[in-house]
Each structure stands twice: as structure tokens, then as C-alpha cells.
């Protein structure tokens, strides 16, 4: 829908009377029909209240009308004054757009020049009559209608419901001459007239005709009733979002605030919670920055004079082709040919010589030239350029057009131009001469620039960079990034004026903004710097719960931004971590296979308006005509990114409790060393004694021979007198343990003294002493012998083992080298995976490179187009750029959405592999690596996960002939119970083996399940009936045959290989290298196994000396002291217990003695009866 870029003044009229532009009489009609619904007080700033019903207010359009929907448009809805009038007969007189002639304004009022006068008619259904007069600079124009096809009919305007057909005309009076022009048929019901200051006339929202500039309007109703009233409003144009219902305005939103601008951009009255792209409001009028190279200037003026005279006199058609035309090009000589510019600079100038032509005017249009006559002065460059009033072969024509009241147009001549591309001649706005360079730069502000003939819009800043070569610096997409002042050598950078921001919307309010610069125009007070952007809000940054999440951060209800951690999940029970040794058969090999799965991609949000228009205001206005094109593109990217973020957040979780328990070194705050059992020695006895025994006894640790000490202790049972009787024999030699306690020493000392005391009579008493001494010496001697033998064995075995160890470690070194090379190959493969992951960046580069394409426009720079062409012709060229760039954006969005779909499928596959490969052992062959799965480890990788699958790969196969079961005597059937078992025959014997690993064994009855019989029953059906049993079955041949009948005739397109643009991941060479390295590693492993066997053959079988712990009891006097102390303590306790209190032993005894001495009678007690009721 074409949007007219004008502002309007609204005039709703009911009953009033004015004289000379002033209302002379009117009254407020509170009883008028619909008064309360149509009259309101204008809010501050000229805004219409949100609860206004907009009865009989229509959306203005130059073409077709919108029936239902939401439209963003410039409409006359910013009111400068509003008043209501009523009466039997009213005439407004002339009401001017500057406010002259207006009544008492209701609510807000302003004296600014309004753009529209609008009449809203609140009459009853009966017909009213009136006229409308327009005052223009060339005379008075009357708009009227008649039910006669002839102009001479009854001239008036019927208001209300019209019966019959009425035809409308415009009478124009210039001087003494009056002419009429037919403008159209009047609608059956008239509810609104709108007249703009530029002469556009609307009825019920539709433009009927154009007059040219209008100064004032006089609205006259001659047959009004007392119940009729009107409202008069003066209004200006405003950017609004309009909800249209049945061609009438239902409600509006002014696009004047941050949230309202966002609503207008989204074409929605309610914006869902989320993140949205936007750009700060930019001023329409921008300063101009110009930089040129030092050149020698010579200047020429190209001046075009246009003069004409309309037809005049009696019987002449004053609005027909002019009677006389005189067009002159200064310094042009028709005999010498075209006027060519032979200087370095020139300036074009259009001079209108005509005068007193009334509503006539003339102008020079662009025609089929790629530039306008006046716009070549905006530093447009040529190699050569020539002008002529005669046709130039190979040139273009600029028509000179005269128009009457902008309604009738006549071509009165043409200016012909011939040019060639180059930079030798430049059009300039002002003449310059001599050697000079021009530099007028506005720094640190948004500016329109022309730098070394490159036009655009941006912010120019002084840069610290230093480049020796070049004077302009561009990106791969052709955008100007910076330039050098050739006279001073200073480098300047150029950045976009308004980098797009991301606004955070929650509950219909903007609570935060993500900015590319540390500057906010959204009214936020707190700005924090984050690694990749600035974030502005009014939040307190002390919240913990995010209401919106995006990627790895979230936003709270007050606008505070926080980091979003993975979801913390907790389970009631945690499985213990169990490890076990796996036995691998010799005909299998172990392989670790690497697999990469992408689970996420970097979210991309493209600001459509910035990408297409790069901040050009006029381009942004044209872009709005594409309605929801940008909204669709941005919504697709934004919603896909949010869905991606939600899926990743749902996938990545952690259990803090499980993470803690997985660390075996800590189990919370508990020290588990007290519950760890001691290691047992022989039998069920435990090595070590209790803590009390360690306190009461002194412990001595020695080394013993074999089981001598254990057998000795078992024999003596702790009795010292059994020491010699329990002597042990080691290799036929009697031995006793080398440690003797004090009791044994006392016993043998007494034996020795007794043998010496009486000489020969008691010498036999010392025999036990001598035997014990000799046995203990034998114990020591044998220990020394065992140590010497062990030393010889160790010396021989160590020398033999060293050679094998050196060879083994040499092999290990070779294996590590080959493993390193294999891992290098894996790294190469991962680099190629990274290239696939980086294709998103390639897509962005391709998207930005499309900005260099002009899409059949004269330039890829929007500002350059507007500098060279008139507005209408420039709009046509920019429209091509908009269409092309939107198409490029759509291709990019399609590619991005396809990538999102692929990543989502990959993420789901990664989730399955984590559950099946990492958390458990997969039974699916080839799912967790190409082999039989053992276990898998997962590691994080850029934008994905890397799985290291440990699998078994078979190296040898056993071919067998398997059966599904057995049939005994033709009656009894048996089938295998487990589906992973196979029954086969080997020679004359039947065996069962696992299908996973060849482990033949003799079958048992537990392996079989008996079935009813040996019969195998089949159901005989036709092919057409198969799909009734198996719905998923598809007859491929039949389907292809049916498709072949339906295919139309076609021609195979000629697609060359260069048109196939798809990333191919070629890992063939790397896989072959990995296979070769794997074979070399397998050979090295076998060699290492041989060396390990050699090392095992050198194991030393030593005669171990046992570690013996002997507890030595304390001497007798220690026990005596302990007994004395215990007796004393017990005596004192008994004394205290028996001698204190009335019930003590001695007190009871004394009372008994006294009773015997005094009397044997018990004391008498009186008994008194007590009756209890």
C-alpha cells in the first residue's frame, strides 16, 4: 500500500458559524447523537486517548484500502487542536493551517503549522447539503456534487446517506475565468473529508484528487439540524501502528517510545517476552562531511533557462499545452554540436524564467538518465560529459515538463546528455578553482559523507592506526572502514551510525538493552561491561532467578543480567562406581575411535533494517512498504536461536551430589579410615591387636622364618614354661624365636643359677638354658643364611631382568611415538571437523559480500544513489537494492534454519550416545564406535562433544552353520532361550556359542525352550494384502510406476560441477593413515607381550622372612603396684558408701544395739479412722 508522506490537519464539523475565518456562533451540544463517543480532550503532546473509539475515522490511502489487519503508516493522528461545534446552520469560514480561524481547543493545543484539515461528520441518517471551498495561491476552488451528469445541475454536497448517484466536480476561478473538472462519483455514505496542505483531498479515507498547495478551507452546511454536530481538529503527521477493522480505525499506537517503536517494528500491539533487535532513533537531517584529493580545479557552469506562456484570452484552454515555449542552454551553439565540459569541475543550474503563469510550473525530470540534472552537483564523477538541446546518439534524455496544478502534465522539451564513466570531471555544488584539497569532516557524530568520491553514512573518528599505503580502506563487502588524510597522514575510521541493539522485553516493558557501545538512549542508569557487549538496565543485580534466558545468560524481572548455570538435578539414589577387569580374547583387538557431534551453534541475530539500509532514513521508509518482511526474517532467526538455547539448556545438566561422590578421596565430611578392616594373615586371624592391647603391652616387630613363629605361638598358648617344649624345626634344625620376654629370661636365669650352685649334682638343671640358647642361635644363623641365598638370587635375576626391561621400554617408546602420530592424525581430522563447524562464519561472510552487489541498480551505495538521482528515481533504484538484499537475507535465513535443524538432530543423537554409550554399555553393534562396545568417554569440544569409544574389533572369524532349534523324533521342538546364542555342529558334536564372541561350549537343557511341535506355519497371502498386515510395507516397484505416470515432461537442467556448493568432509587419507598406525601399534603390542613374558620368567621366588609382632608382658612388680592401687581405691569407695547417710551400714548397726539395750517393744502408734466419701 502506497503511504503518502504528508501530515494532516483534522477538522470534525457539526454545527457552527464563522465570519472572516472566525467562528461567530456555536454551542456545545451535549444532547447530540454520539457526542460523548466522538468528542475527547487531547492529551499532552497531541496524542489521542487510548480509549477513543475512532468512529468514522479512516486510514488514509492513495490506492486500495485495508479491510482488516495491522498496518504501520504515517497518518494525521498527532493533533494540534480539537474542538466541537453544533447548530441549525453553520459555516466555518476559512480555517487556516496555521490555526487561524480555529475554536476553543479541548485539551492540548499547539500553534505549529498543521498539515491537514479533516472533517468528521456526525449527522443523523437524513440528508444534509453543503459545499467546500479551498483558498489557493492562484484563486478559489469549489468542490461540489450533483445528481445530474451535466455540470449545470444543482451544485451541492450531500452529507449523510445519499440516495441516487452524485457526480463531483471542481470549479477553479482564476481572475474572471472559471473552469470545471470532473473528479469522481460521491460515495453513498459520506462520513469524513480530509484536505492536506499539499492539496490532497480524501473522502472516507480514499484520495479523490489533488489540487496543489492549499492555504485555507471553508466548510459550509446549509441544512443542519439541532442534533447535528462536528469536531474540528488540526493535526500533523505521525508514525503510528494502526489496527484496521472493516476499513475503520479500531485503535492506534504512536511509535514514539522505545517499547512502542518495538511494537511498530514487530507489527504487534503486544510484544511477547524476549530479545529484539532495534536501532536508536536517528535524526533525519545529518551534517555533511566531504574529503577530496588535492587537485587543480577549473570550473564551468551549465545553465538551463526555461520559459513558457500558457494559453490566454477568450475561448482559450488555459490548462492545455502552453502557447509558447523558450528553452535555452547557456553557451550552447547548435551548429557546433553538444556543449561539452572541458574543465575538472562543473556545476549545473536550472533557471525558471517564466512568470505570472498562475497554477502552472515546470521542472526537469531524470528521464532515462542514471542521474538527475540537479543531483550531479553532489560530486558525481564522469570521464566526459556533454549537454545539448538536440538529440545525441547514444545519450540519454531529461524531459522538461510543464504541469497545471499538478494534474495535467506536458513535455515542452528535453535536455540530452552524453557521458562516459571516469573520474576526470566532477560535479560540485559551488565553483572551485586553483590547487586545493577540501576536507570538512564532522567527528564523533553521525554524518553523511563523500570521501574520495565514496558516499555513505557513518561516524568518523580519529584512529591510532598507521598505514603506509592506501588512502581508503574497505571490508570484503565493500563498506568503507577508514581513510587517510593525504595532506597530514592522519587515519580516520568509519563505523555505522547506529549499531543495532538488543532490547529485553518482559511484561510489555523494556527492562534491559545489550549495546555495542557504552552509550544508551533508552533511559537506563546502570551500564555494565561484559566480555562481548555492554548491558544497560535499572536492575539491582542481586537476583538469582532469570525470567528470560538466552545462550549462557539470563535476565531477571528487574532487568538484571546473570549467568545461567546448567540445571542442577538430584536423584534419590546414586549408583556406585564399579570397576572390573575385562578379559579380551586373542582373536580380538581393542580400538579407540573418535567421534565428533555438534550440539550447538552460535546464535545469530540480523538487524534487517541495518543490513538492508545501513541507516539511510529514506531507505528505511521504503522498507516499511514490505510490511512484515523484516519481521519474518528476524523472528525466524530469533525464535530458532531461543529454541536452540532452550534445547541445549535442557540437555546439559549436572548432579552436584553425584559429582562429589565420584571423587573417591572425599565422601563429604566423613573419615572412613576407622571402618576399613585390617588385612588378614593366615586363617581367620587378624594381623594386629586391639587399641587396648597396644596400650597395655610393648610391641616389638621382628622377622621370622616361614611359619616358625606362628606355630610356636599356637603351641605355647602364652605360657612361658612351654617355651622349650614348643621348639620348632626348620630344615631339620631346632629353632626358637629370637625374642624372649622377662618371664622367660627369669626362668632360664634360674635354671642357669641352679645348675651352677651345687656343681655336678645340679648341672642337669642348666640343660634347658643351653638348649634354648642354642635353638635361638640356630634361628639367627638360619635367618642369615636365608638372607644370603636371597641376595644371590636377586643379583642373578636382576641382571637378567635389566636387559628385558630395557628392551621393553624401547618398545614402549616406539609405541608412544606411533600413538603420538596417530593422535596427530586424529587432530588433523578434528581440524577438518572444525572447518565444517566454521561454515557459519563462511555463511556470514557470504551474506556481507552480497552488500557489494548492486542488484541491477546504478550503485551498491544507497547514499550515492540519492546523491545522483531525484527522490522518485532514486527510490526506484533503492527498491532494487532492498529486493536483492532481502532475497540474500532470506537465503541466509534458510541456510541458518537448515543448520539449526541439522544441529538439533545431531544434538539428539549426542544425547542418545551419552545415555547409551557413556552411562551404559551399548548392545547395538556400530552405534558406539564401529565395533562391539566396551565403554566410552565424552569430552567437551567447540560447539559439540567428542566421544572416545573403546570397542572390540574382530581379527579372526569362525565360520559355522547355525540352526534355530532342534526337532526330536519329529514331534518335540526346542529353540534357544537366549537370542544372542547360536547352535552349530562341529564335527560329530553340537556346540553353543555367543554371537558376540566365539566361546563354544556343550549345550545344556537350560539353553533351550520346548515349543509345541516342529511344524513351521506360514500364512499364504498376495502382495496386495501384505500392507494390510504390515502397514509400513511399501511396494517400491509399484510406487515408482505410479510416480512415473504422474511426472510431467521435463528437461534435465544443465548443472555444472561449479554450481554444487556443499562442504565435503574427506577423511580417506587420514583414516588410511590411522589404520596403518593401528597395525604398527598392534605389532608393537605383540612384541611387548613377548618381552613381558620374558620379564615374568625372571620373577624371584624368595624365601620370605615373616614379619612377626611380639608383645612383651610387664614384670611382676608392675602388676603388684597396679593391684595395690586398685585395693586402695576400692576400700575408699566402700568406706564412703557404708559410713554416710541414714541408711548407711554403721548407722543401721548402731540403731540396732540401742534398741536391744532399752526395750524390745516397738513404739505404739494410735490409729485414727478416716471415712472418705
From Swiss-Prot:
Region (Heptad repeat 2 (HR2)): 1031-1127
Region (S1): 16-536
Motif (KxHxx): 1169-1173
Keyword Transmembrane recorded: yes
Location of the region described as Interaction with ANPEP in the Swiss-Prot/TrEMBL record: 417-547
Protein name per its UniProtKB record: Spike glycoprotein
Annotated consequence of substituting residue 336 to N: In strain: Isolate LRI 281
Any one GO biological process: fusion of virus membrane with host endosome membrane
Signal peptide range in chain numbering: 1-15
Alphabetical list of PROSITE patterns matching this protein: COV_S2_HR1 (PS51923), COV_S2_HR2 (PS51924)
Result when mutating residue 424 to V: In strain: Isolate A162
SUPFAM superfamilies the record matches: Coronavirus S2 glycoprotein
Result for mutant: residue 248 to A: In strain: Isolate A162
Membrane topology label: Single-pass type I membrane protein
Self-association and partners: Homotrimer. During virus morphogenesis, found in a complex with M and HE proteins. Interacts with host ANPEP.
Region (Heptad repeat 1 (HR1)): 767-886
Annotated phenotype, changing residue 775 to S: In strain: Isolate A162
